[in-house]
Amino acid sequence: MNKIILITDQPPLDNASFCPFELGTIDECVEYISKQEVVGVDTETEGKDFTRNKIVMFQIGTADIQYVIDTRTISIEPLRAYLEGSAIKIFHNVKFDYKFIKSNYNIEVNNIYDTMLAECILHCGKDKWGYSLNHLTQRYLEISLNKEIRNKFIGLEGKPFTSEQICYGAQDIQYLLKIMDIQLKEIQQLGLSSLLLLETKTSLAFADIEYNGLCFDKESWLTNADINEGMVHKLEKELDEEITTNKLVEFMPNYLQLDMFTPVEELRKVNVKWSSPIQVKKVMNSYLQINLDKVNAFELYKYKDKPLVTRYLQYKEKQKISSTYGKSFLKYVMKDGKVR
């Protein structure tokens, strides 16, 4: 008979009528888990950013007994030796949990099996096949999980868990062992065991890369972004000059829109938006006296001896760098000042 054991320093928000569970201690959990060669592991977190958010629930157990630990009041430090040891720990999408466990507790989980990764290998990562835990429980066990509860851990703060949340946490690990057994039979039959081992090691390597992040020099980046923006503006002016020099009058307005702050000599005399492929195509067709369908680098390279084309290709290169790796790139810099 399945048993759910909650470990917390505060009582749950409601009774166990929705999901029967018992109360236990972290020592009892360690005693039971330390005897197991294979366990399922999962976490519930405040959010998706391991540099900002915390683990609020840690689940570990077997198909028969699942321990649901309220990590806001109970530390999983007593489980360190087991998690870093040789027993098999089954996760679903281990990269996510691995980074949170390492960030919150400086524990590096070893000897991992990832049910999501195994499923991707079995089905070549085909789109629309479905690789969520709910997809797997339905596919292999004909059991549906209510994943809507997952969002109820966000903004939980110090509130006690509901029995619904406790049950949800337990179910996330209850079926992992059965799924692994089914997957491994097929993996072995197909001769994919070595591939699974390689992919698992690679997944953890990438998890460490994401965890460590890339150091980022914000000041130098912004200086370089300003330089690139300046080069883009310079090339835009040179492109405008090519329009006036070649007297492409259809792209030169009959009048200038004056304002109080811009000198007349600085007003644009060309009404082409150089970042617009549609407008640039009209310019190139008029300038080259041909009918281009596209104005990408491949199509224009054959006309690179033409000054306007040369300037435009230079502009596109710098404009791409400026838009992709300019000031907007700062949105990828995380709280700790690193890029992930």
Protein language model features and the residues they cover:
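Short alpha-helical segments and helix-capping/turn motifs at coil-helix boundaries
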Residues: 24-27, 43-44, 74-78, 190
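A short acidic-Thr-Gly-centered motif at the start of a beta-strand
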Residues: 23-37, 80-83
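Alpha-helix boundary/capping residues
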Residues: 33-36, 86, 105, 125, ...
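Active-site-proximal helix-loop-helix substrate-binding element of RNase H-like nuclease domains
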Residues: 2-20, 49, 53-188, 196-198, ...
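Short acidic, Gly/Ser-rich segments with clustered Asp/Glu that frequently serve as metal-coordination loops
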Residues: 38-51
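Conserved "right-hand" nucleotidyltransferase catalytic core of DNA-directed polymerases
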Residues: 1-21, 179-340
